[in-house]
Amino acid sequence: MAKQLAFNDAARRSLEAGIDKLANTVKVTLGPRGRNVVLDKKWGAPTITNDGVTIAREVELDDPYENLGAQLAKEVATKTNDVAGDGTTTATVLAQALVKEGLRNVAAGAAPGEIKRGIEVSVEAVAARLLENAREVEGTQVASVAAISAQSDEVGELLAEAFGKVGKDGVITIEESSTTQTELVLTEGMQFDKGYLSPYFVTDAERQEAVLEDALILINQGKISSLQDFLPLLEKALQANKPLFIIAEDIEGEALSTLIVNRIRGTLNVVAVKAPGFGDRRKAMLQDIATLTGAQVVSPDLGLTLDTVGLEVLGTARRITVTKDNTTIVDGAGTAQDVADRVAQLRAELTRTDSDWDKEKLQERLAKLAGGIGVIKVGAATEVELKEKKHRIEDAVSSTRAALEEGIVSGGGSALIHALKALDESPAVKALEGDAAAAVGIVRRALVQPLRWIAQNAGFDGFVVVAKVSELEANHGFNAKSGEYEDLIAAGVIDPVKVTRSALRNAASIAALVLTTETLVAEKPAEEEDAHAGHQH
């Protein structure tokens, strides 16, 4: 297909226009008084959300050059979501501001490479200061972090209780409830870091995950490549009329293609994953999963082979959720006594080992077996509200986990304002000269934008609020919910520092790339080609 090119300033301006369109769509959602965005869906009801990354994923622009800019801004939101799980709107607003200010300097003749270097040095200084200013999460602050992210005090309390019970490394999953109530249920379950072997296994295309309800579970220690060995068991599973979940060292060749074909045709709802761990540890982890689900590990060591076993070796679980990276098994059918015996065995091993590495791995396995899983059942009056609520609670779980990892800073955009002092004090920033030194001003002007938009969305004059907060002492800022200037940490208006730092770094990364772009290459729209084709004689 023919390509079209754009160069120099025109190229950068197109990228900026695309970033602006996406950022302007997203930034109306920022803050406690932020508005919602309605997303049209090809099937079913529209989605209403205030989650930056969900909105960003839906944006595709007509102009191919502007669309490149929008996709770059989308990358900022997606990357921030992957690392911290929240802060996607903040990241997009910061990227927009850095690009806008930076391009102004480049258009005036500044060297893009120097501007890029200045932005990177300044952002690192601010990110380091944010970490210095962070505090550990204490008591009720867990509920505050969750409540701010989900914009609901009720959800905040629920998540504080969930993390209190499963611990900061514990697994929390989110399911849809058949009632209008949102509640927390603690269940037996475990999570391990292996995802589906093929994207064809996905059952929920929007969330890119495979969900099996009331599934049979086959645990095979070796590889499965021959269909001949595997077919008898597959046919028995088909007759049982239940979904099938397979864990094996690997599944390849005709065995994998048969599973995929059956899945696509709808003959058998099946998902396959690789076994977690390596060597002897893999064997032990498979035994843990077998204990939890009431399965038997199919292994020649135990005299069991795939072609000779029946349904008696399969375990079951109420629900299994598989993403591209993780598998979560909830409510396995293993008996409480078997699980308790296995936990006791692991504890005994733990007391016998001297190796720190072994201890760490045994602790992990213990936590997975004994810790259980917190299941939040989300209820709402309508399907549209249910989806929107689920998005908010997912954000809140990620935010809370981030806060427990690296600590918290004052929220509402004020932490970035207070961290600006680092630009006056950092030796690395002071050493910058020429165009690189001019980039410090770009970062200074960009970092006030999140606060400005939080205030603006709440109906206040953003510039006035920014000027006022700049004069306040550390941890004090503007509470957009009440319209007061106060100690935000005491008021429970807090952000996980990991979220703020990820947002800042990802925004700077994309902005630096846009500023140093000279040429864009995009596909020519099909209509244009057709129009030219008609004039050939």
UniProtKB/Swiss-Prot annotation:
Pfam families: Cpn60_TCP1. The keyword Nucleotide-binding applies. It is found in: Cytoplasm. The keyword Isomerase applies. HAMAP family: CH60. GO terms for molecular function: ATP binding; ATP-dependent protein folding chaperone; isomerase activity; unfolded protein binding. Forms a cylinder of 14 subunits composed of two heptameric rings stacked back-to-back. Interacts with the co-chaperonin GroES. One of its GO terms (biological process) is protein refolding. It is an enzyme of class 5 (isomerase). Belongs to the chaperonin (HSP60) family. Its EC number is 5.6.1.7. GO terms for cellular component: cytoplasm. Keywords: ATP-binding, Chaperone, Cytoplasm, Isomerase, Nucleotide-binding. ATP binds at T29, L30, G31, P32, D86, G87, T88, T89, T90, G412, D495. It catalyses: ATP + H2O + a folded polypeptide = ADP + phosphate + an unfolded polypeptide. Together with its co-chaperonin GroES, plays an essential role in assisting protein folding. The GroEL-GroES system forms a nano-cage that allows encapsulation of the non-native substrate proteins and provides a physical environment optimized to promote and accelerate protein folding. This is Chaperonin GroEL 2. Its main location: cytoplasm.
